[in-house]
Amino acid sequence: MVHVENEEQPIKLVIIGMENAGKTTILDVLTGKIMETPSKPPSMNPTKGVERSTILFFQKETQVWDLGGQETYRNEYLSNPDKYFHTISFFYYVVDIQDYYRLVSSVMYFRGIFNLIKKYSPDAKVVFLFHKTDPNYTPDERNLKGKFLEKIEPDLKLANTQYIMYDTTIFDIRSVKIAFGLES
């Protein structure tokens, strides 16, 4: 379970991942824009750059940064890390568990971001959301979650970083809330 220490500094939580991974939809659950389980995926516009919101996270006001996942923005974050990665308390990396063709790109992006976060926010807690584990989704021989973890675990071990992971879906809003400590 995600845990918040008794911190004096404000909490900064970043949600990062490839485009179309579901980051903004997750944030809409956290901010109350989506309160009931939808019957189909909501239609969303891509996040342009960084969108900031404030949520109550473990009874503490928390700044949430939703970093748009389009390639242009990903390159911007990697090129200007001092602008984005200071004072991060929680680093949520969202993986679209159904997007086989983007797995390698997602691994590479995670590695780049992870190295910068370790440099600029070495105490940030790492949380993986394996998103879109929808009711009709059945893990097949591709085993994207296992393949993703197999690729990135050596990086995490080398940096002596522990992590937490959750399977989430917009079709079970509770799964998202649990990942952010809003329900148990």
Roles of regions detected by a PLM:
Residues 98, 132-135:
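Acidic beta-to-alpha connecting loop that harbors the catalytic carboxylate
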Residues 59-78:
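Switch II (G3) loop of P-loop NTPases
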Residues 136-184:
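Canonical P-loop GTPase G-domain recognition
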Residues 75-100, 116:
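Inter-motif core of Ras-like GTPase G domains
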Residues 100-120, 126:
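Amphipathic helical hotspot of TIR/SEFIR-family domains
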Residues 89-93, 117-132, 157-167:
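Conserved beta-strand/loop subsegment of P-loop NTPase cores
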Residues 36-64:
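Conserved substrate/cofactor phosphate-moiety recognition/catalytic segment
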Residues 1-42, 58:
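Conserved G1/Walker A P-loop phosphate-binding module
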